[in-house]
Amino acid sequence: MLAGTWEALVTGQVDLAIGISGEYANPGGIELRPLGELAFVFRVAPHHPLALLQGPLEDAQLVHHRAVAVADTAQRMTPITVNLLPGQDVLTVPSMRSKMEALLRGLGCGFVPEPFARAQIEAGRLVHKETARASPLARLHYAWRAERSALGLGRALQWWLAQLESPVTRLALLERHAGLLP
């Protein structure tokens, strides 16, 4: 959903991007359709110092604790940073799986998609903390290169696009993450 995904699509490294942000200027030749909205919630391990604090957490409190962030893979486009505070120490990890592992170990704190952390909350392995600032809501899309070739879209891409027309498929992609992350 960061710039690296757009870059891979625009440069032809991928034919289809699922979960991409629609906030970037479309350079042309890219078809974009809504996937849905995904709420991000603030999570920490039960043994993290922020877990003990009462009430909504203020930015002035958060800035003193290391955030865990997934690195943007963009090489040519400007990388994007989200939900980090100026001056905050950051542990940058390569994937959402790594971010969840770091949060579970108490190595930092951070916003994660609500469905990704649902099982850990239910198991008591992570704690939900309210923040004074609004929790982010991501409007996600799926996108593909419309001008793929003179022969048209490949069969696999056509199949995926047909599947993505279904609201059930789109909801499953947003909500069903049990067993995929630690």
Task: Give the label of every model feature segment.
Residues 140-145:
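A short beta-strand structural signal in non-transmembrane regions
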Residues 26-107, 112-137, 151-154, 158-182:
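C-terminal regulatory
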Residues 148:
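Catalytic strand-loop-helix junctions within cyclic-nucleotide turnover domains
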